[in-house]
Amino acid sequence: MTNDPTKSTNPFEILGFTPSFSITPDQVQRAYLQRLTASHPDLSGQSAQTLDPATLNHARDTLLDDEARANLMLEHLGGPSPKDHTLPDGFLMEMMQLRTQIEEELDPSNPDHAQARTQWQTWANAERAQTIQTLTQIFKQLESPNPDSSTDESTDSPEELKQSIRTHLNAHRYTQRLIEQLDPTYDPSSADF
């Protein structure tokens, strides 16, 4: 980690955070506004090294996006790269069945398609929330391991925990695509999966 955020490309460093998956949107927004204010030419002077707004915007957007922040954090911890496409056993078959069911239920010829869309959106949002909660718990184990804790029931090694994060992130991407499929403007003939 560099001490000078103007020389960094890491969103955590740019906004002055110690890398952590658990940072909140409020913390990100506050840090972003502080850096943006400090970088304003009227306040910082022309000679001061400042961060350009595009860099700050990118850092903020990355840290506000759960998946992007998790990938950044996993990279920071030395975990598997996004090129690792490991998925839970049976997951692809389940996704194929869900996609078929969603397409059938959202077909405009189905008289209940509007109600089905709402139900599937609720399901997808719950899946997303569960994934983020799971990732948060695993990252907490990696960020602050406490061998004396009686509440930590995990016996997984740090490498196994990192692989678990990658597997959850890969599954999360599929769920995100299902959420996109629920958009009323979604066109199955132009889908990229």
Set out the residue ranges of the language-model regions:
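C-terminal accessory/regulatory regions appended to core domains
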Residues: 1-193
